[in-house]
Amino acid sequence: MASFSESLSQDPADAYKSAPSITKPMGPPSPGQPQWNPQRATSMPVFRYRPFAKEVEPIRLVDRTWPDRVIDCAPLWCAVDLRDGNQALIDPMSPICKRRMFDLLVRMGYKEIEVGFPSASQTDFDFVREIITDGTIPDDVTIQVLTQCRPELIERTFEACENASRVIVHFYNSTSILQRRVVFRADQATVKAIATDGARKCVEEAFKYPGTHWRFEYSPESYTGTELEYAKQVCDAVGEVIQPTPDNPIIFNLPATVEMATPNVYADSIEWMSRNLANRESVILSLHPHNDRGTAVAAAELGYHAGADRIEGCLFGNGERTGNVCLVTLGLNLFSRGVDPQIDFSNIDEIRRTVEYCNKLRVHERHPYGGDLVYTAFSGSHQDAINKGLDQMKIDADAADSDVDDILWQVPYLPIDPRDVGRTYEAVIRVNSQSGKGGVAYIMKADHGLELPRRLQIEFSRAIQKISEGEGGEITPTEMWDVFFEEYLSPVQPLERIKQRVNAAEEDGGSTSIAATVKINGEETEISGVGNGPLAAFIDALGHVGLQVAVLDYSEHAMNAGDDAQAAAYVEASVHGHTAWGVGIAPSITTASLRAVVSAVNRAMPR
């Protein structure tokens, strides 16, 4: 495949051709298509698919009320990152990552957390036992465990939860038309019996563990592909077995296991179920939307309008295929309209870093509320409007004799104040053109082998733009490297690393120690420290000589291959409250990471 630069060197007639396998639509227009619409039919096999109403007979809800409702309070949230999210990862979470994710969810305020499928894997079983026996679960948090309806799996599930204070046992079976026909090859009565037999087994097992407060959740899996009348029959039959009460309700979870229709169709089905389920006052109606059609957030919000009480999802929308509904987006959508989500998103970057670390998946730059670029305007007119909005906020605050943080947020193009989620205005009101940043990042990677993190790209591109505007003309790759070297690699004051000796832990979870020789303001001194790796040990050592350093972000990569390969490390650090990026380059990734810390310290400290 030709590179971008190679494509530009092709014959001018071919340089801008793309996607030669795509055939321009040349078919007839649709019946009744207006003359002002020039689009034509494609050659794609549309005939292989059919409208949703022909696949699952819809319920006609002519007196629907959900469109007129207004959300004024948060639903009960259930975070399923540790199970439904974890099962979709290329590399499932390690036990350490699971503990970090669980701790994050607890600190954010989630009171119901799905922690695993203990009958499906020994890893999940061990994790559930660990957090119970270690006393990790706070008194106000209920763990949720998933199981199929098979008796031996239910027994194993209850065994995993022994001695827990409060547990939701979530049992499920698929009820859809397609799965009944293709997977189970069973009729409605047989599939319903699977659910009721599972419910009876859950009740039976609960009696064996009287020290735990048990609650039950049932999901007619593939609910969106199930006839509504039949879904109601199955749920009602399960309810008759469980015998819930208003004080100890059952959770009926209605998942869009595969998103099959527009969000309004899902909302209609939720309102119909909410109206028609037996013993509704003893039911918590729960939603679990997936994002196959890209409308999981809308489906969840409209389903909540339609009568649901609870929503299951994952932080930043992790999950099978296109993911579960994003709890960050749902929560901050409420926040942006003045409704407390009852979840703390006040440091969105810390949340994102933990999620990226645990999931080993990057959060997209454009992901609502959490992406690197979501509070950034590249358009000049947008920047102008934002600047004027921020200025007007100050004027309004002064007129009200109030602090700007205490008045109504009203700034064009920014649905919330970035500072309310731990961001700053710097990237909002001081940005370069997108091509400027893109060009800097491209040259640094293509010519110098450096894959700068996004926020470092933004910072460094400002330095390049300042020089370009001051001197005029083009900044060559060599000139760009000189600027980078001078800014990030050259400074040796006040801190200079001379050498170090690292004693790595021999076992997982052990401590690493470091002894290093450094110069501080020109004076050579010996320092030592201990941590869970060389970087943490070095930072600990710096703390002993009065340098308080906290790593906010870290990344590394090999710059080339072969025996003479170099490694690059990037550290965003807080040094005595001042944040700065540092860069280190060395044959060893350990040395590169230590150099990056030194670089960050020197850039953060007065020179």
Curated annotation (Swiss-Prot):
| SMART domains registered for this protein in UniProt | LeuA_dimer
Q: Which sites bind Mg(2+)?
A: 84, 288, 290, 324
UniProt keyword annotations, A-Z = Amino-acid biosynthesis, Branched-chain amino acid biosynthesis, Cytoplasm, Leucine biosynthesis, Magnesium, Metal-binding, Transferase
Main location class? cytoplasm
UniProt domain Pyruvate carboxyltransferase: residue ranges: 75-349
Gene Ontology cellular-component terms for this entry are:
cytoplasm
Determine if Isomerase is one of this entry's keywords.
no
Task: List the SUPFAM superfamilies hit by this protein, alphabetically.
Answer: 2-isopropylmalate synthase LeuA, allosteric (dimerisation) domain, Aldolase, post-HMGL domain-like
Stretches the record annotates as Regulatory domain: 491-607
Keyword Transport listed:
no
Pathways involved: Amino-acid biosynthesis; L-leucine biosynthesis; L-leucine from 3-methyl-2-oxobutanoate: step 1/4
Which EC number(s) does UniProt give?
2.3.3.13
A single MF term (Gene Ontology)? acetyl-CoA C-acetyltransferase activity
Q: Name the chemical reaction catalysed here.
A: 3-methyl-2-oxobutanoate + acetyl-CoA + H2O = (2S)-2-isopropylmalate + CoA + H(+)
InterPro entries (UniProt xref): 2-isopropylmalate_synth_dimer, AIPM/Hcit_synth_CS, Aldolase_TIM, IPM_Synthase, LeuA-like_post-cat, LeuA_allosteric_dom_sf, LeuA_N_DRE-TIM, PYR_CT
Q: Where in the cell is it found?
A: Cytoplasm
Cofactor(s) recorded for this entry are:
Mg(2+)
One Gene Ontology term from the biological process aspect of the record: L-leucine biosynthetic process
Q: What does this protein do?
A: Catalyzes the condensation of the acetyl group of acetyl-CoA with 3-methyl-2-oxobutanoate (2-ketoisovalerate) to form 3-carboxy-3-hydroxy-4-methylpentanoate (2-isopropylmalate).
Subunit composition? Homodimer.
Record-stated family: Belongs to the alpha-IPM synthase/homocitrate synthase family. LeuA type 2 subfamily.
Q: What is this protein called?
A: 2-isopropylmalate synthase
Encoded by which gene?
A: leuA
